[in-house]
């Protein structure tokens, strides 16, 4: 969740006004998801939050690296204010992790067998009738070769 802006915090850099409506929309959708948490397991309830977090980070990543629409100063400010996940973006820049859905899917310490999540396995290596759904974030497959 982004930090609150008060009178004591630094003003956002130039260009923030152009992307602020989209970031506010992401923030409103996050609040809506948090308020409508229903029944189900913990991971099923957290999956929409992980997906929206991924979308917001991907939006900022695309603005800076793909479209080059924002300045370095604004990009660093957005990361510092927690509008995007800097660690996830750092992984997206590495080969093989371009489509990574969340950091939990590559952490081997949190899995039963000490391996990565099933969503990281390429679909060509799985059976055709096998349905892949991540237990952490609800991803349907984020291997870079898919």
From Swiss-Prot:
It is found in: Nucleus. Keywords: mRNA processing, mRNA splicing, Nucleus. Pfam families: BUD31. The keyword Zinc-finger does not apply. This is Pre-mRNA-splicing factor cwf14. One of its GO terms (biological process) is mRNA splicing, via spliceosome. InterPro entries: BUD31. Coiled coil: none annotated. Disulfide bonds: none annotated. Belongs to the BUD31 (G10) family. Involved in mRNA splicing where it associates with cdc5 and the other cwf proteins as part of the spliceosome. The gene is cwf14. Belongs to the 40S cdc5-associated complex (or cwf complex), a spliceosome sub-complex reminiscent of a late-stage spliceosome composed of the U2, U5 and U6 snRNAs and at least brr2, cdc5, cwf2/prp3, cwf3/syf1, cwf4/syf3, cwf5/ecm2, spp42/cwf6, cwf7/spf27, cwf8, cwf9, cwf10, cwf11, cwf12, prp45/cwf13, cwf14, cwf15, cwf16, cwf17, cwf18, cwf19, cwf20, cwf21, cwf22, cwf23, cwf24, cwf25, cwf26, cyp7/cwf27, cwf28, cwf29/ist3, lea1, msl1, prp5/cwf1, prp10, prp12/sap130, prp17, prp22, sap61, sap62, sap114, sap145, slu7, smb1, smd1, smd3, smf1, smg1 and syf2.
